[in-house]
Curated annotation (Swiss-Prot):
Modified residues (Phosphothreonine): 288, 291
Keyword Membrane tagged: yes
Subunit description: Component of the 1,3-beta-glucan synthase (GS) complex, composed of two alternate catalytic subunits FKS1 or GSC2, and a regulatory subunit RHO1. Interacts with SMK1.
UniProt name for this protein: 1,3-beta-glucan synthase component GSC2
Intervals, Extracellular compartment: 1-473, 533-550, 604-1579, 1642-1758, 1843-1895
Amino acid sequence: MSYNDPNLNGQYYSNGDGTGDGNYPTYQVTQDQSAYDEYGQPIYTQNQLDDGYYDPNEQYVDGTQFPQGQDPSQDQGPYNNDASYYNQPPNMMNPSSQDGENFSDFSSYGPPSGTYPNDQYTPSQMSYPDQDGSSGASTPYGNGVVNGNGQYYDPNAIEMALPNDPYPAWTADPQSPLPIEQIEDIFIDLTNKFGFQRDSMRNMFDHFMTLLDSRSSRMSPEQALLSLHADYIGGDTANYKKWYFAAQLDMDDEIGFRNMKLGKLSRKARKAKKKNKKAMQEASPEDTEETLNQIEGDNSLEAADFRWKSKMNQLSPFEMVRQIALFLLCWGEANQVRFTPECLCFIYKCASDYLDSAQCQQRPDPLPEGDFLNRVITPLYRFIRSQVYEIVDGRYVKSEKDHNKVIGYDDVNQLFWYPEGIAKIVMEDGTRLIDLPAEERYLKLGEIPWDDVFFKTYKETRSWLHLVTNFNRIWIMHISVYWMYCAYNAPTFYTHNYQQLVDNQPLAAYKWATAALGGTVASLIQVAATLCEWSFVPRKWAGAQHLSRRFWFLCVIMGINLGPVIFVFAYDKDTVYSTAAHVVGAVMFFVAVATLVFFSVMPLGGLFTSYMKKSTRSYVASQTFTASFAPLHGLDRWMSYLVWVTVFAAKYAESYFFLILSLRDPIRILSTTSMRCTGEYWWGNKICKVQPKIVLGLMIATDFILFFLDTYLWYIVVNTVFSVGKSFYLGISILTPWRNIFTRLPKRIYSKILATTDMEIKYKPKVLISQIWNAIIISMYREHLLAIDHVQKLLYHQVPSEIEGKRTLRAPTFFVSQDDNNFETEFFPRDSEAERRISFFAQSLSTPIPEPLPVDNMPTFTVLTPHYAERILLSLREIIREDDQFSRVTLLEYLKQLHPVEWDCFVKDTKILAEETAAYENNEDEPEKEDALKSQIDDLPFYCIGFKSAAPEYTLRTRIWASLRSQTLYRTISGFMNYSRAIKLLYRVENPEIVQMFGGNADGLERELEKMARRKFKFLVSMQRLAKFKPHELENAEFLLRAYPDLQIAYLDEEPPLNEGEEPRIYSALIDGHCEILENGRRRPKFRVQLSGNPILGDGKSDNQNHALIFYRGEYIQLIDANQDNYLEECLKIRSVLAEFEELGIEQIHPYTPGLKYEDQSTNHPVAIVGAREYIFSENSGVLGDVAAGKEQTFGTLFARTLAQIGGKLHYGHPDFINATFMTTRGGVSKAQKGLHLNEDIYAGMNAVLRGGRIKHCEYYQCGKGRDLGFGTILNFTTKIGAGMGEQMLSREYYYLGTQLPIDRFLTFYYAHPGFHLNNLFIQLSLQMFMLTLVNLHALAHESILCVYDRDKPITDVLYPIGCYNFHPAIDWVRRYTLSIFIVFWIAFVPIVVQELIERGLWKATQRFFRHILSLSPMFEVFAGQIYSSALLSDIAVGGARYISTGRGFATSRIPFSILYSRFAGSAIYMGSRSMLMLLFGTVAHWQAPLLWFWASLSALIFAPFIFNPHQFAWEDFFLDYRDYIRWLSRGNNKYHRNSWIGYVRMSRSRVTGFKRKLVGDESEKSAGDASRAHRTNLIMAEIIPCAIYAAGCFIAFTFINAQTGVKTTDEDRVNSTLRIIICTLAPIVIDIGVLFFCMGLSCCSGPLLGMCCKKTGSVMAGIAHGIAVVVHIVFFIVMWVLEGFSFVRMLIGVVTCIQCQRLIFHCMTVLLLTREFKNDHANTAFWTGKWYSTGLGYMAWTQPTRELTAKVIELSEFAADFVLGHVILIFQLPVICIPKIDKFHSIMLFWLKPSRQIRPPIYSLKQARLRKRMVRRYCSLYFLVLIIFAGCIVGPAVASAHVPKDLGSGLTGTFHNLVQPRNVSNNDTGSQMSTYKSHYYTHTPSLKTWSTIK
């Protein structure tokens, strides 16, 4: 169609052809150029046609005509005019018939088939075994349409001749093995015999025929059927065959399970087996029968495989169809059982045995419809549901069982892996199913009590011990090497009487032997891994490894490593050299290295001898389903080795020289230093003396964590380098010097996009290229990416030729000038979307791309998109109204600022439409000249909201424009429907004879093109909630169907139960835009398949995909999310992308040739998944959107490029293409156990890898993808991913991959997936360990007199002053550590910078990097890392991982302080503030510049949520927010409030305590989730023990800093610092308890009475208690300062220690004393109001007060902490909000909007403005009052210290003696102050004979 066609005005509304992105009407300003239709095809006049453009008998070279046969291009291969398309047998009648029921999933067009005698088809050309791959099946051939002279007949005759059959490649071929009627009869017969549903049968018939048609279009029908049977049933890659042999069903069929004797073969049997094997290898097809007789009785896998292939080879086409049909019918109704592929195989096997039996064939009456579902599937479904949900009060409630108690899909499935499992299937009468004859088993399936059959086959226990087993090799490669490094560099530990002044060395044997203990460490790790495996894999399961032998082997190896080392230390006395010991030590070191290497390389599952050895069939199932890894070959394998050799070579070298050697001096000094301290009242100087050794222990532990971190650092660097190298190799980098990407673009379009080899009518390439290029440009114009003047410059135009009367095509100058870099303003708007898209298109075509097949040969594929509640189409209200009270901008305003050029194009377009419509309606010409000002005023509405008239067609345009620039389903559908346009375009361009055939009949041509597109491409949206949509959602869904009639929507339909008390009936239904609309406005479904019950048993998405999966069509599925986009130019590459599956052009081998070895063929590892790139279209919408986009780009592109090559890429959902047959027969496209499979997509990838599939990555194709844009939504996604990784750590997939992958693949898998998250965890862990080390180290430095240090002097020199402590090397370690953490952090930015550099050039990369730095994105990265690790820690400790829907909108609203604080306090702010206090102590105690980095990092943890909050620093909003914070703290105690401090505390606590099940129907119960109580052991490990270690570390530092080091005192002068901690920790708690008892008594006695006259009793009571708690805690802060003798440094460490001790107490109380939380908040309000009698708690009202009192004790301290911390955070923002115009600068930083495009401040009414100002004044006063009080608490004691007597507290005696720290005492006992000054040097010099004796 023309883009200046005035008849298109209303088309964007109904959009019947479904081809546009809303198909806006479009216009051309100038009329002198030739028009183009929607494919970019020039619309030619009849004259032009007569001039020969489309006459096959004439050829052109740029318009020059040649006589037939003399075209010089004929000899040039691709342009050669081969045999005519029409010279094919014309007499093939259409065999299909119409029987009143349309089996196709689309409505046929044209007259019914068989009506006309000439309704004929071109037969497929056989592509098997040796013919051309082209199929003409889809091209209509009408007798008499075109004759040899090129004459045309009546176009109507052509239309009548169109094929009406949806499966032409199969039905039109005379060699089809079975006619379609017979196939249909098979389906109907099976449906009757098994009781399948009729709709399911129709659906599966269409599914099967589409598969046959898809394959027949590129191979012969016979080969298509054979390959399909091989894929589903009998081929080496068929899952059914793999299962059949794994579960030894062949032996069941031969001798019966009951007669099987599995065990070792006798010697005689082994000899016979060897002989048979030789016979099979030498067998030829002729003597197959003889070989079969010879191997009879041989049960080996080879013999079984030979028998199988012989059997398959004898199958007739009828039997093949029947077998596939039966499998598909079982699969189509299997519901949740589709997630258990081997269970489904077992059901199919039983059904197949029954089908082949006489009992089935002779059965007179069919089984009732629904028998298969109700009798076979529903009992299994109900069992699976009962594991996750239980019935409480008549409704289904999620069970509280954790994963290790839930028998999930995988446990159910794995029962069927082994004959021993199948043998456990027992009837109610005790009969084993296997004891029945095979043909009787199917009818007995309904009698099995499944509850008694299934058991756990792997325990997903919530424990960190999974990491010990799964990643044992990682621990060995790090812990053992770290031990060896440290042992070698810590000689002082094993040197007798080491003295630094002499630097005496240890015996050589000791050095060797100590390092050799690394081998023992490795053995210990393996023993621990084996013991953990024992606890995770039940011995009951037949697939469990035999661990006893491995355990004893490991013990022996540990003994071999440990024994000689003990000998060395025992035999070799520490002062006497022994040659024997030296030799043993050295040998043992190399034995240890060998042990270390062996254990590092060998997978745990393959240690000593693999339990899956192929000589026995015992473990074939585990080999098949958990270890069929596709091997890497050639360059890929060497690259994989090279990557990891490089990583670990660099890592071990760098770690040794940088990390370990920086520890050498601190080890020497700290291990030999003993402190001269007075000590503590309770235990003297026992602890303070060894403070250096405690510090050393902490330093070694901290460095140990760093030792893990730098491996990940090197992985990032090496991966990036290799990825960059590959990008240069492929030619996708912008820096690649040898490409002229735009100059060569036309040629590349011709060679890489178009399949021109088989074209019948040959054209000059320019004619074909121009149509493709013009279509791309016009599609961009229609999407308002280009203005009309840009379009004119970019299009190919027809111009007069030099030959008179002829026309030729002129290429746009763009192709030449683009490479000259002078194109910025000439062809595109600068930095526009159009420029990006065309640049990528050009760049991608310069890479190697598989050759495309012709359109009619390409396979059929489906795009599948799950939809839940995402926006379909934005409403007008959402676009032009501010979305909430905190927003300052409407969505439309924001979009206009983000896309100014596109808005301008849209407005111009709309104005033209409005003017034309007005002219058409008024029927008169406009005045020629209007007043310019009036015209501008009239245009204002267009520029503001996009329309002037409120007519639906105008408002809809604006809605569509906004929806196409937001994350909506409409954007996704309009984008991916470009596949349809691309297929039509390619088909039209590559088959010009079709255009000729139709002549001027545009409608007939369009229908033919649509039919081809419909045949090759389906779009399926799984819209599970459609039946429950609200009216506006329904309206939007209906709009989609009208705009895109071929769109298919699968949804869940619900009907009330037939009988009362039963469950409602639920159906999977399918509709499209062709479905009839019923009276109620709904559409009549095409297919409606009943399910066993509600299919949503998991977290939603995977179940949603699974229920819709039965409606997919074709061979491949592309999985897409509802916030993606696609573009026409990318869709043109679809044929090449599908060719990546390596199934289109391969040499076909007969799959059932006997003698082909099982598992030895390269085809045994098909491509399961092809991943693709994503462009994050939200990348420039501010700093956070850009950070999220950058991460996605680097992960999805830069790393995926390398990972795919070295075998480490998995499936991440969108936008991957999957091999549908491979994946659907192996459990589907995702996994669905609730909680465990939270990140559902990645499990499908792991499943594919485990089962032998390959995963590739496609560089030249990319989709668009939206990402979260706000701080909260990005971190919600982060939390979901982190928690999901916690669940993955527990999963069996990680166990199989971790214990069975070869070392290089294992390392790739680990560092690409769990390693990233564990790295984040290690970073946070190292930060906390460092803080603990810093506190102790700086306490040591603060109390010591340090030596004058010169690093260049020998270590044996005497240090001055005499008696000093040389802690400089230890203090300098802080600098080295900081540098390490700094590098680890900044390395995260390397990939994104490199990615930007290679794709967009140096300038863009530098620009983006500095933009990120100036926008403080490093602070966000620090915070996000903490959220990752917090989510992971929390999930493994307490569970509760759940699906968090991610944000799809723009983050322009200011979020209240209270919401941000409550959301991030537990995960980051608390940890940051505790660490900040410790850092403050470290900074004050001993200043070092490197600590500035930690100040920045910890500031990020505390302040990041507020820095990235829009308009956080607007003055008025800030104080109104403060008002909201104060109200948040105080509300919720009188009556429930959704957003209150008490609600936040209760929800946080419930994650540990869990909720009670009792409900009283209160509103407060709605916000509570279903948290179950966490396991107490996990809580002790995760909460109490780390807290106790931290408290102990701080306490040791505190007692040391008070231990009076260097002070000349007596034992009587020892201070009582422990009592200070006890007082300041416990006194506030005791006072709080007293206050609570008083309040409780008062509320119980007078609360109900007061409540009658005072509505706020509860709030007042709570306010009093909370206020006292705040005051008490502040008072005891000052008390600690006083007790520490007004020393600020000592007070700081005292406060830190008190906080840690209180945390420990409260954790213990929560875990050990608190019972479950009620879902309602009645207990809380009753505590303050005294109204216990009306709570509805029943008898619990008697026990609840005690529980509530315990909780309130904790709450008062928490309230004080939140009050103080919240105010501190707000106070620190004061300097920022005082900066003039800070809000504008802050908005520029967040949104990257120029000042001219700034978001305006909101406009308020006078009343609102007055009210706001009054509130601001009031709360501003309160804010400054609190600020003054806080300042007073710090300034007061500091000033008072000068006026307080020096001997304060000296009068205290007894236990309280020295409670106050002495002030102004000298701690310098060095030099002349030493009591042993003169003899000091000599007394510390050892006698020579103590160290140098040599034997």
